[in-house]
Amino acid sequence: MNDVDDAARVRRRVWLIVGAVAALYGFLRLSFGPLPQDPAYHLLADTRTFLGVVPRAGDVLTNLAILAAGLFGLALRTRMTVAPEARTAVNVLIAASVLTAFGSAYYHWAPTNATLIWDRLPIAIVLMSLLALVMADRVHPLFARDAVWPFTALGAAGVILWGISEAMGQGDLLLYLIVRVGTGVAIALLLILRQPRHTGTIWLVAALVSEIIMAFFERFDHEVFRLTGGLVSGHSMKHVMVGVALASVFWWLRVRRMLTEKTSRR
């Protein structure tokens, strides 16, 4: 099969995935109705103010961990093992990582559904650009080029749909949740079921483990705050683990090396 056929096949797969996600959303939406945002989501544990200036300081300031990870990726960008067709996906991932720090800090400064949009939007783009890069490593290199914009548009659509539905009085998080959970599951399955084209898989595993720990901290925000005697909340630790996960991904892109075709199929 020649390069033209490969490119056409990858594009078909990309749009098949996008269509399947849209169909799954439609089925679940018709079957179960909208999934509203829990109003209690904004009632986070750490409400302390820093120097009388920074409200909810723990959750605001720990976004520095995410910013540091994004800047780490930016510093490594020119030294990453990345094919030309994957450069755009890497640039999107780095930019969205930096924007996640600012979007999250903005949300935690004044937690509302309106500000939460700017937290979730770059997160969705991070996840979908990462999925494109992992599929490039595990399925076909052209996924990095051909999937990055359709995938990130799909992720952004989940956030925008939720924002619009909230404004209309019937919030629906369903598509965003499919993107958020589905991306993690898809990456885990790709790591288990498909052979890599590059070394360094351990760093992707580290990112996935960080994601699992992050979810734990998010779920037990108040409990962690109580157990640490009010030192740090679960949500603040979530931000730290996001930074660890992103740094692990960027280090994977930096240290990985291309495997031979024979080795990658073992």
Where are each of the predicted segments found?
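Active-site rim beta-loop-alpha module in soluble metabolic enzymes
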Residues: 157-198
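Active-site-proximal alpha-helical scaffolds that flank and shape metal-associated catalytic sites
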Residues: 151-155
